[in-house]
Regions:
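Structural preference for long, well-ordered alpha-helical segments within the folded cores
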Residues: 21-22, 80, 107
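N-terminal beta-strand motif that seeds the catalytic metal site of vicinal oxygen chelate
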Residues: 1-18, 65-67, 117-119
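C-terminal "cap" of GNAT-fold acetyltransferases
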Residues: 3-5, 37-51, 104-107, 117
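Short acidic/glycine-enriched loop/turn segments that link adjacent beta-strands
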Residues: 37-40, 61, 95-99
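Core segments of cupin and vicinal oxygen chelate
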Residues: 10-50
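Short glycine-enriched loop/turn motifs at secondary-structure junctions
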Residues: 3-5, 59-64, 94-95
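Mid-chain, well-packed structural core segment of small domains
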Residues: 67-79
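Vicinal oxygen chelate
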Residues: 1-2, 32, 83-119
Length: 119
């Protein structure tokens, strides 16, 4: 077996409509068609990467689990989020690898901005 890429990430959220708006309006994802699956959710895309939001009643965000978005300019990305009312940590350097900072979506899922050092 040879895997070619990650097709999508599935993310549980408390309110699919609210979180869909966040991922589209704040982070720049696009909505893509989603079949009726019998529960609320949304399929979103950024380029050829997909994010599937699944509404889970009583959802509580997991601790420590996260995924990262690569950015060319972490300060500009952080400023954009902050002007949209998103609380974002200060960027920190991780060894000789990258700059990173963290924020949460409306359901409390932890997300990361990641800029390669030297970029």
């Amino acid at each position: 077996m040879q895997l070619s890429r990650v097709h999508h990430i599935s993310l549980n959220v408390a309110d699919a409509a609210r979180d869909t708006k966040f991922y589209i309006e704040i982070l720049g994802f696009q909505a893509i068609p989603r079949p009726d699956m019998g529960f609320k959710g949304a399929w979103l895309a950024m380029g050829d990467q997909q994010l599937h939001l699944l509404e889970v009643p009583g959802f509580e965000a997991p601790k420590g689990q996260h995924f990262a978005f690569g950015v060319a300019d972490i300060q500009a990305a952080r400023t954009h989020l902050m002007t949209q009312g998103v609380d974002v940590s200060e960027p920190t350097a991780l060894a000789d690898v990258c700059w990173q900072c963290f924020f949460k979506d409306p359901s409390g899922n932890l997300l990361e901005l990641n800029q390669a050092l030297g970029a």
